[in-house]
Amino acid sequence: LLYIDDGSKDGTVREVKKLIEQDSRVHIVSFSRNFGKEAAMFAGLEKSKGDYVVMMDVDLQDPPSLLPEMFEWIWQGYDSVATRRVTRKGEPPIRSFFARRFYHLMKQISQTEMMDGARDYRLMTRQMVDAILSMREYNRFTKGIFGWVGFKTKWLEYENVERAKGETKWNFWKLLVYSLDGITAFSTAPLLIASFVGVLFCI
């Protein structure tokens, strides 16, 4: 069990170290500051050693009860079992609106599959994890990378669950920047638009 602490200041590291004293199978990677979700996920995958790897948030918005079913699909030959929310219960309406618009836009301009409501909660084989780690992008957009590497994936749906404790650090500006990273990383549309505008100014 590997915890990734993204520069928290709420005593998380102290509590995890207590767990480590009780169980040697528990480990932690603690960042010196907040580097963001993408860096945390990459560090977790890089430090993982098992034949199968599960990524999940610790706020319990990713239901652990799905794990048995996820492994059943892996035994049936899937390389990855991914999850998506079919509702956005408890989420601000404006955030839900822009999230839906983002996924709709990506379907139009990108050749890489990105499911609406996709979560980072996912079970993967070691082969898929290694493929993801081989991509050393500086500005990572893991939701796109999952689709780009092309492994056989089963999708499980569930209704959104409100976080058990705490508040999200993702404000509108951070979500906008993250969305722009996804658009520029997995679509040629921005480049084509820039080229077209450049040609117009040269005429």
What are these regions (language model features)?
Residues 13, 17-20:
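A generic structural signal for short, well-ordered alpha-helical segments in conserved domains
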Residues 141-203:
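Hydrophobic helical membrane-anchoring modules
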Residues 18, 25, 29-33, 37-47, ...:
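Acceptor/aglycone-binding surface of glycosyltransferases and processive sugar-polymer synthases
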Residues 5-13, 60-61:
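A conserved acidic beta->alpha catalytic loop
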Residues 22-25, 152:
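Glycine-centered tight turns that cap/initiate beta-strands
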Residues 1-8, 29-30:
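Short beta-strand/loop segment that forms part of the nucleotide-sugar
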